[in-house]
């Protein structure tokens, strides 16, 4: 039996050892006046391997009243599940700022941090009102094998209607990627490291992305 030991800082769960740092956004949306710089990235995560970003969100464009500022707040620029290209929060323009009009709540969150096993599990209600869906995500890490396993689940009472969703994983600009012929795996090269990302249930696509962070 593993203990539930939240390693939480400012709404983020952060688990790390000397080689790997795994962090997940597991915080509810703050009140309106504190959302000037808020990004709708609930359950998004980042992975740092040996001091180098492997999985990285797109970053944040700080200048107000700019399309890139609005875009960088969207869920599509975060490593998370997006339904029908809609963000998990709705923004409204107030003066020159985009503030959250409809926020979300984290419904549950838990983490396990053992020497040979890590886990983060959380869910949010950002798609409940419009799509009657709760997004739940679980990420496991096995330090001895350097292996991550992730699960995304949409919990819906009414399953009669199909919904379109995408799960995006943004990679650091320093990575090199190659897709296997069966469209089920991506080979990732990060300096002197090699990683393999696989998905058995869906095809994987590679596309160009936007990176607003500082390139290493």
Question: How would you label these PLM feature ranges?
Answer:
Residues 1-56, 60:
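Carbohydrate-active enzyme catalytic cores, enriched for enzymes
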Residues 1, 60-216:
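CBM-like, beta-strand-rich accessory domains located in the C-terminal region of large
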């Amino acid at each position: 039996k593993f203990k539930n030991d939240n390693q939480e800082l400012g709404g983020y769960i952060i688990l790390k050892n000397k080689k790997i740092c795994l962090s997940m956004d597991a915080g509810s949306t703050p009140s309106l006046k504190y959302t000037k710089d808020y990004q709708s990235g609930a359950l998004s995560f980042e992975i740092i391997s040996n001091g180098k970003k492997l999985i990285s969100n797109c970053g944040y464009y700080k200048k107000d009243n700019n399309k890139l500022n609005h875009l960088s707040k969207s869920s599509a620029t975060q490593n998370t599940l997006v339904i029908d290209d809609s963000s998990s929060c709705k923004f409204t323009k107030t003066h020159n700022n985009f503030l959250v009009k409809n926020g979300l709540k984290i419904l549950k969150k838990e983490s396990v941090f053992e020497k040979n096993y890590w886990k983060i599990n959380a869910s949010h209600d950002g798609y409940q009102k419009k799509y009657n869906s709760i997004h739940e995500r679980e990420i496991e890490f096995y330090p001895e094998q350097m292996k991550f396993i992730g699960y995304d689940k949409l919990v819906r009472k009414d399953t009669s209607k199909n919904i379109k969703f995408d799960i995006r994983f943004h990679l650091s600009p320093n990575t090199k990627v190659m897709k296997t012929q069966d469209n089920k795996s991506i080979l990732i090269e990060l300096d002197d490291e090699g990683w393999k990302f696989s998905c058995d249930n869906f095809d994987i696509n590679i596309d160009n992305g936007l990176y607003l962070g500082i390139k290493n």
